[in-house]
């Protein structure tokens, strides 16, 4: 289903990012690319989905085949009929302003009948219980909500291959569980999945193998059953995060002295975006003392990024 042997160097780089990297992924398998940032995961996906060399310039050698077809002579559109892609930053793949139109965009470009397009769009939002995101301005959505729209867009294309580049980078826990259900559904349908990830816990029961990359090479290919048995020390050597959230512990930190001065004070902050009826922020108040670390947590769209932009003066 996916077969490749690739080396690649970006046009402005002296050293290759991928060093004659090879792999074969049979139909219906889910492979997870792991490794530290900069090891070549995203570059490999770009080589497979055609963005390299058609968008990112550089020197590429080797081959890539999807469903037995060599992608070397294909346009990005032709590759898109075989494989759907989800990128780290959903804004980089949006072509419309309306969320429903975005999910329909790929189907329209492949010439499907309007009735079929509308059916697929409605089904995508309904199956994954995301009706609240229909007909929304994508630039008024949170980063996590935009990522969900990009995932629905890929799902609606109904290709045999799905390529996902760190799809949970902007997702909260609940949205990550939604993505897990989407991937489960695709796996049951016999789709082939290749994704790069740092978070691994949600892929239990979905991933068949974990391929660990380092310096543009695949250092090891580990079946899911073997990876689950890794000790914390083994995972640390391989730069793998935990596969089980129950293993995570949070050490207690010493309390700050009461005399430590405040360095940030937020008092009764409210904010409403233009064209929105409801407030994004309402009555937010807190203070931060010197050397104190505060984590803002909450569901996608609750206002975390908006609050950060207000504090930064953006």
Regions found by a protein language model. Give the residues of each.
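The feature captures the beta-strand-to-loop junction immediately N-terminal to the Walker
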Residues: 34-36, 297-299
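Conserved ABC ATPase "signature" region
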Residues: 115-133
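Conserved ABC ATPase signature
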Residues: 137-141, 145
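Hydrophobic anchor residue at the start of the ABC signature
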Residues: 151
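ABC ATPase C-loop
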Residues: 154-155
């Amino acid at each position: 289903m996916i077969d490749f042997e690739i080396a690649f160097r970006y046009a402005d780089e002296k050293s290759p990012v991928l060093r004659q990297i090879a792999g074969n992924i049979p139909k219906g398998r889910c492979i997870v690319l792991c490794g530290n940032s900069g090891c070549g995961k995203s570059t490999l996906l770009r080589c497979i989905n055609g963005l390299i060399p058609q968008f990112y310039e550089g020197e590429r050698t080797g081959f890539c085949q999807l469903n037995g077809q060599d992608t070397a002579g294909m346009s990005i559109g032709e590759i898109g009929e075989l494989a759907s892609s989800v990128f780290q930053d959903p804004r980089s793949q949006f072509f419309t302003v309306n969320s429903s139109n975005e999910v329909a965009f790929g189907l329209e470009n492949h010439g499907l009948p309007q009735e079929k397009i509308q059916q697929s769009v409605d089904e995508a939002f309904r199956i994954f219980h995301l009706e609240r995101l229909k007909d929304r301005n994508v630039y008024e959505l949170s980063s996590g909500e935009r990522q969900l729209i990009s995932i629905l867009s890929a799902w609606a294309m109904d290709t045999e291959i799905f390529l996902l580049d760190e799809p949970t980078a902007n997702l909260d826990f609940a949205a990550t569980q939604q993505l897990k259900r989407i991937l489960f559904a695709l796996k049951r349908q016999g789709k082939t999945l290749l994704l790069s990830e740092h978070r691994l816990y949600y892929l239990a029961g979905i991933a068949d193998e974990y391929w660990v990359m380092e310096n543009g090479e695949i250092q090891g290919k580990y079946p899911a059953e073997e990876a689950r048995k890794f000790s914390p020390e083994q995972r640390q050597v391989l730069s793998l995060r935990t596969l089980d959230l129950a293993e995570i512990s949070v050490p207690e930190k010493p309390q700050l002295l009461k005399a430590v001065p405040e360095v940030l004070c937020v008092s009764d902050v409210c904010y409403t975006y233009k064209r929105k009826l409801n407030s994004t922020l309402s009555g937010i108040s807190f203070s931060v003392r010197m050397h104190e670390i505060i984590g803002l947590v909450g569901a996608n769209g609750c206002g975390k990024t908006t609050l950060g932009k207000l504090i930064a003066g953006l």
